[in-house]
UniProtKB/Swiss-Prot annotation:
It is found in: Nucleus. The modification Phosphothreonine is found at T85. Residues 86-98 have a biased composition (Acidic residues). Residues 73-82 have a biased composition (Polar residues). Residues 73-98 are annotated as: Disordered. Keywords: Nucleus, Phosphoprotein, Transcription, Transcription regulation. This is snRNA-activating protein complex subunit 5. The keyword Transcription applies. Its main location: nucleus. One of its GO terms (molecular function) is RNA polymerase II general transcription initiation factor activity.
Amino acid sequence: MLSRLQELRKEEETLLRLKAALHDQLNRLKVEELALQSMISSRRGDEMLSSHTVPEQSHDMLVHVDNEASINQTTLELSTKSHVTEEEEEEEEEESDS
């Protein structure tokens, strides 16, 4: 019974580290998404000023952003051995307390 409890605790720790790693990855992807949206917005602004080939260029940008192949080339960092900072550990403790 004691060994089973230890196994469950190890599994819980692993899952918490995985959760933290996925949370970090999600935050990185959100930042990347905002950067891409900003690039698109700035290019649209530049295109409005030049006013030639506007529809074709903006369409190409949207196709590139929505291109499934380019999205699938993004590598996800899912290693459970990633370093968990003290802040993340504190956040995990706070979340588990609620």
